[in-house]
Amino acid sequence: MSTLLSSLSKTVHASLALAIVLFLGLFYLNDGIAIDTLFWSWLFRYIHVIVAIMWIGLLWYFNFVQIPNMGKIPDEQKPAIGKVIAPAALFYFRWAAAITVLSGLILAYLNGYLHDAMTLSIGSGVPKHTAIGIGMWLGIIMAFNVWFVIWPNQKRALGMVETDPETKAKSAKTAMLFSRTNTLLSLPMLLTMVIAQNLY
């Protein structure tokens, strides 16, 4: 067990294998598997939830753990964060954001409410689609912030792109402010997603 848990790759593969075994067991208890729209909808919802947890988890890690504690780290130790931990976290952060939005759009399409949600149900007046639509737009805005504001500014702030010290400091502040904007939007976004799935 120690060998399995000492390797992240082995741990993730074992988790995936366990999930597949559970999936097969539960579906066989339900008279087998039909690879139909319901199956694909379930699969994309599962993917959507997993990558959304990673995305928002990293967003909250940056805002609740890393940013508030950077001032407490001695200057000689800061390169460990800026050169190693932050770039790795930002890789998963930005790709989780992209896959969350993409899987959410596919899920909405498979369930037949993509257009209704994207137009906030104007014209049809379906409250569930209005709620999920608000959540989708908030998620799209947040993902846009990740890819087109936070990431470019973080590259300058972390020294991944050469720039002068003044631009580096300005970029760090801009990245932080947009990260905080995403934190501000995260609870309303999650609220509308949960409302759409559970109140209607």
Segments the model singles out, each with a brief description of its role:
Residues 1-200:
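Polytopic transmembrane helical bundles with strong interfacial aromatic enrichment
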